[in-house]
């Protein structure tokens, strides 16, 4: 029985997923090479930006999110709201724990461990950038991580929606308290544009597509034929996004390699810590894997568009705080893909079906 399960699981892994580590490494190399050897490419792409949101990246994120939105049965959203445990895990982890552990971990590394490598003023800037990341849980990419771990799409949507509502009110006071800054300005155009681009548009598109296909072709065709056409769309979109991100940041990586690595250390540790905290809590509460995995992923990943925009507004484009938020962008995808792999390999820790979420 055990061997059959292993064989079945191996067959279920697609070509892209099986060699995802190789593809990610290749995309990072390609992205940095393009940014360095063909500087006109990132320069041209950077013109297609509004409210700190890259339009090319937004299009690719649509490609990644759309397949998951197709799977949402909207009657299940109402059911998801009746099972609050997964939402409680997400909200408590994201808003009562994550910002403060980010501050402590980042301060420990920047001000103590790396004090001989980073000047004090720069350490304070890096700490500020880390806090901005820690106070902004993910809005868009969490749908990708949920999709890759077979998360419940309807429940993930509810988790993200609740976090976005809290974000509107909690981000500013948390950042102000941790950084001692009273004039924190939240770029609401970035916030609202991201919600519209990365949640509302894919959600409406998925709903209309699902409704049309089911009515015209039937639910069996939709689930067994139509959905399968999108099997590799998310992975391809993810890899192309990775190339664009590293194309944009090639100069930062090559001009500050040591500081990029130093900043990446506490950000990576924080990401793993928050994921395992929420994931372990979900296991203790006997939540199903398709709720536990997204709960861990939302807190582990960050709303980097918002963090970068606030860093630029408060500290300036060339500040250490902005560099720290940019490094957050660089490490997020490779680290989150590692967590996706861990989540998929520990699926057997969780009950198949939970009576109460």
Swiss-Prot record:
Spans within the Cytoplasmic topological domain: 1-21, 71-93, 147-164, 209-232, 281-296, 341-357
Name any one Pfam family assigned in the record. SBF
Q: Name one GO biological process term.
A: response to arsenic-containing substance
The observed outcome of changing residue 138 to A/S is:
Loss of transport activity
Its placement in the membrane is given as: Multi-pass membrane protein
Q: Which InterPro entries match?
A: Arsenical-R_Acr3, BilAc:Na_symport/Acr3, Na+/solute_symporter_sf
Q: List the disulfide bonds.
A: none
Q: Which residues lie on this side of the membrane: Extracellular?
A: 43-49, 115-125, 186-187, 254-259, 318-319
List all membrane-crossing ranges.
22-42, 50-70, 94-114, 126-146, 165-185, 188-208, 233-253, 260-280, 297-317, 320-340
**One cellular component GO annotation, for this chain's record?**
plasma membrane
**Which compartments is it annotated to reside in?**
Cell membrane
Q: Sorted alphabetically, which keywords does the UniProt record give?
A: Arsenical resistance, Cell membrane, Membrane, Transmembrane, Transmembrane helix, Transport
Q: Which GO terms describe its molecular function?
A: antimonite transmembrane transporter activity; antiporter activity; arsenite transmembrane transporter activity
The record's listing under PANTHER family reads: ARSENICAL-RESISTANCE PROTEIN 3 (PTHR43057:SF1), ARSENITE EFFLUX TRANSPORTER (PTHR43057)
What does the function comment of this entry state?
Catalyzes arsenite efflux from the cell.
Record's family?
Belongs to the arsenical resistance-3 (ACR3) (TC 2.A.59) family.
In Swiss-Prot or TrEMBL terms, this protein is called Arsenical-resistance protein Acr3
| Source organism (scientific name) | Alkaliphilus metalliredigens (strain QYMF)
